[in-house]
Design a protein with these regions (language model features):
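Short, cationic-aromatic polyanion-contact patches
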Residues: 17-23, 76-99
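Short helix-to-turn junction characteristic of helix-turn-helix DNA-binding domains
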Residues: 31-35
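A short, conserved structural fragment
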Residues: 66-76
């Protein structure tokens, strides 16, 4: 897979990532590396090293990312949600491609962390 992305798109992606706080950026990077896999709120909290409860993460950060159409959330049961990056977002699609091509080692680390639960 070859990324055929112009400089303007790469610049926009950098600007988008720079505009996010550390937690939101960590979430998007983790989800981009494990795409197309989805994770629960608890799994996501562990992946990014979030020390609070996944419920507080959901109320603030995750809901903001969902409102901005950066992530997609599917409700599997009343208390279990599947969270994944929105690969249809034009800039996040580029991020997913970058992570897929250049982030194989990091992807392996994330997937190993998910297996260790």
């Amino acid at each position: 897979m070859v990324i055929d992305t112009d400089d303007a798109t790469m610049y926009e992606l950098i600007q988008l990532m720079a505009s996010l706080n550390d937690t939101r950026r960590a979430i998007l990077l983790a989800l981009a590396h494990i795409y197309p896999r989805s994770v629960s709120g608890v799994q996501l909290s562990r992946l990014i090293g979030y020390s609070g409860k996944s419920r507080s993460l959901y109320r603030g950060v995750i809901s903001h990312l969902q409102e901005n159409e950066m992530i997609q959330i599917d409700q599997l049961t009343p208390k279990l949600y599947a969270i994944r990056i929105n690969n249809e977002h034009p800039l996040l699609n580029v991020l997913v491609d970058l992570c897929r091509i250049h982030g194989k080692h990091t992807r392996g680390m994330y997937l190993k962390a998910l297996e260790e639960e």
